[in-house]
């Protein structure tokens, strides 16, 4: 029986999780750094938040799982991609605990962790993956020991687009900007025309963001658009672009399953649009709820276990972090 403790801190969510080798999630504690409306989270402030809470989350995670440090077989942490200072703050703590508890370390790619957690929770076998979050937007499929990127954003991530629009309209960041936009969008009735940019399987979101920001700033000129209609229209355009590129990837790869992962993946409207598309192809769509879609420690623990079970660990001298760590850089040794 193997127990892995996972540490996630690539952005504003700090997560500690413990997973057993059969996929049982024993604990999944998370604490989010939330800023006032209209503000984003700076790397140095986020890192300070992580340093302040990480040890208490480790204690809570052990308590919830009813385990002792001596029961933990390996420590897994997010190597990247993500924000530099928060990543480093978590990595330093993991190195300290590794030496204190005399346990090996496994470095994990954040994107791979999202994918493998999605496969674990849903039972999806070989899906086309729509990975949508605050820092990443990619259409991915597995082939020849790699998770290969067939399409991605050429500028900003979809979650970043939503977050930045939330700042413009000054809505709360609690529990998250994207969630609050989703709730406002449900009240929208009028679809406003916005830029729609897909290039093959790639997408671009900077133009649509610039356009809708301009509409908000022109409200003093008595524009007729309500905040609800703006949120509704933004979501409809963004998600239509994502679903279109995902469908192209499905056709290209000859697959009939779609798995949505990442923080934006728990948006109910996006899930609904994916389901509408895949049902026309007689396929299946898979999605997970906010416990595992949003950044969390359990996903790092599970991805760490998949690496660890093959006998691979990361030497202490190589437990570094990197802000740029692409999904297709990782050798997926645990899949056929």
From Swiss-Prot:
EC number, UniProt record: 2.3.1.234
Cross-referenced CDD domains: ASKHA_NBD_OSGEP_like_euk
Pfam families named among the record's database cross-references: TsaD
Binding site for a divalent metal cation: 110, 114, 131, 295
GO MF, one annotated term: N(6)-L-threonylcarbamoyladenine synthase activity
InterPro entries: ATPase_NBD, Gcp-like_dom, KAE1/TsaD, Kae1_archaea_euk
Keywords: Acyltransferase, Cytoplasm, Metal-binding, Nucleus, Transferase, tRNA processing
Subunit-structure text: Component of the EKC/KEOPS complex; the whole complex dimerizes.
Name used for this protein in its record: Probable tRNA N6-adenosine threonylcarbamoyltransferase
